[in-house]
């Protein structure tokens, strides 16, 4: 598969004028479908993946970055908040960083480790019922979705295995994606906690498009993401 094409090649292949091709390339570049280069365009270098590390393996990755993101996320929570936390490793790091007024907020989670840690901190926590997925220790399935639909959240904090301009926020498992997507819809504010290694990665199950949630990251490697959603960086 050819990943790079010149304007002239596209004109000949599509039997279109140069002005039409350039206009279309501008629009595709804005959408994140291609990257404009001098005289043509290339396909974005999004990496398609499908593997799912265990929760223990995830916790060992990008530890310093996750801690910075977690601290910034914890600072967004007030005592009056009603918060959803999904079963990601970065959201678990967030739970460990909770202090002060954030301890008086109320929490709903589908993460077993999250619920246990919240309870140990003295927080009021509701654990969703449903099917336990061993790989991520997440509660999923119809019962979890039904429970989620009974709540309205002031804030939701979620993880994603990948975030890409052309694919939005994605994850390997469709059932986990369904829980995350439902939480996004039920929240006034939805924050995706993703370290810089997650950018330009695409997984099989879509959570939401890029404009569906704000991004809290240690570093955003591509300024184009800021054209579609709010991006907060801890390394600014």
Mark where each language-model region is.
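Short, well-structured alpha-helical patches and their helix-loop capping segments
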Residues: 61, 65, 86, 106, ...
